[in-house]
Amino acid sequence: MAEMGSKGVTAGKIASNVQKKLTRAQEKVLQKLGKADETKDEQFEQCVQNFNKQLTEGTRLQKDLRTYLASVKAMHEASKKLSECLQEVYEPEWPGRDEANKIAENNDLLWMDYHQKLVDQALLTMDTYLGQFPDIKSRIAKRGRKLVDYDSARHHYESLQTAKKKDEAKIAKPVSLLEKAAPQWCQGKLQAHLVAQTNLLRNQAEEELIKAQKVFEEMNVDLQEELPSLWNSRVGFYVNTFQSIAGLEENFHKEMSKLNQNLNDVLVSLEKQHGSNTFTVKAQPSDSAPEKGNKSPSPPPDGSPAATPEIRVNHEPEPASGASPGATIPKSPSQLRKGPPVPPPPKHTPSKEMKQEQILSLFDDAFVPEISVTTPSQFEAPGPFSEQASLLDLDFEPLPPVASPVKAPTPSGQSIPWDLWEPTESQAGVLPSGEPSSAEGSFAVAWPSQTAEPGPAQPAEASEVVGGTQEPGETAASEATSSSLPAVVVETFSATVNGAVEGSTTTGRLDLPPGFMFKVQAQHDYTATDTDELQLKAGDVVLVIPFQNPEEQDEGWLMGVKESDWNQHKELEKCRGVFPENFTERVQ
């Protein structure tokens, strides 16, 4: 029996719910069709819109916060792995290993604490805040259904009120019929029954209307109070949430900054203690390493071998080649020392070919007066001197050679015009005391006490010696050696090879570095590739000095000091260096 009762209650409840759904659906259809009016509350509808907006924003904030926490978790894992990697590569003998391990542990704890506080103070608060929205949302939906029930009950009650007159007319018609067919006493009972039935339906409709109105108003009043309050609470919730996140993040970064600073101090200390292991590799000549001697200057572009310059004693002009040697681009020695960048080729300048007549013209009558003739007081002629005797018949003492090394021909190979020759200063001590110095540019020749002007044959014989075209039959010219007049000519030309004057006075060498050999001028820029090399610019003058250890000298390289550095510092050890010879041109 109990089972039958429970089944009946369940069936009745289902039937009631179905009846309610049908009634609500019918009412909504009538409202949409305009046949039934709908109760509206604009203020409540605005609150519902704000509620939906607030729910959307809160849901999005919760989603983004969960993403942020997931990123913090991932960052924690990445930082943990990085710290583990540091612990693995940090060798036990290195200083500060314990401090580094402790910093790694504190780093891990700091990340865990930061993540947990974010969960407690931000995520859980967000979940609590959003937990009230589903209940309110369901109450709003229920309030909408109760509003439909209220409208349906109201419409039903109003329909009964308007149909009262129609029912009375329907009841009056049967009464008239009954009056005709039934006795008088029976007609009154029938009319009373119809009136009672109509009143019962009206009373039921009124009760349902009052009940629906009461339920609706209760829910409506509650929601009217809660929705505005919930909407206003969003500001404080957002402020507290983001303040908590910002404060936690600030404290986290402060603590993390301290840990990072401590780790940086440990690493700096490690770097300082192991700084001696870092050194700069500098190439030094040794027995095991290949020397610079293996390096040789690059051959010229025309393929001709680079030969050592030789001194031309006969002073013949060098034959002009097809292409001007000035266009040759010098190359630095290769192998161990990297060569400098290829300099731009210089402009071609036409070389002036010296004719033999121009050379011979230096020894005719116009050239003889420049020779100052001195007569030593203790000199006695070996025999009578005739007026017709030539210079070749004289036996005069040869001049000592200049102490400075003879300048080799310039790499450019261009002939220097004779009009650019400059007189040579003789060394101190060459001439006897009391004799005039040759600083004025005249050639000092020791003549006998009885002198005579040279005859016309003198220039011809001298020119034969200068030109180097000695005939086999001329015995007088063949006997002329370096002890006769050609010694003067050789001395003159050796002092002015390629137009460069060799200053060899003692006073001129006071400002030169010890062991000075000659001067060169850079023709192209050279960038030093090692610490022992000179940095050259086109036009720099370099004072060439010998190597301290001749075995260290490499082929194609010279040791020297820039003239500007020497004049400024006067410190040979700091200013000297090596440089490629084929990037320079000898000037003195």
Curated annotation (Swiss-Prot):
Domain BAR as annotated: residue spans: 29-276
Expression across tissues: Highly expressed in the brain and muscle. Isoform AMPH2-1 is expressed only in the brain where it is concentrated in axon initial segments and nodes of Ranvier. Isoform AMPH2-2 is widely expressed.
Keywords assigned by UniProt, alphabetized: Acetylation, Cell membrane, Coiled coil, Cytoplasm, Developmental protein, Differentiation, Endocytosis, Endosome, Membrane, Nucleus, Phosphoprotein, SH3 domain
Residue numbers of Phosphoserine PTMs: 296, 298, 304, 324, 332
Keyword Coiled coil in record: yes
Entry PTM: Phosphorylated by protein kinase C.
One Gene Ontology term of the molecular function aspect: identical protein binding
Residues with PTM Phosphothreonine: 308
Start and end residues of each stretch annotated as Disordered: 279-355, 448-483
Region (Clathrin-binding): 379-422
Compartment(s): Nucleus; Cytoplasm; Endosome; Cell membrane, Sarcolemma, T-tubule
Main subcellular location of this protein, as a coarse class: nucleus
Protein name: Myc box-dependent-interacting protein 1
Organism: Rattus norvegicus
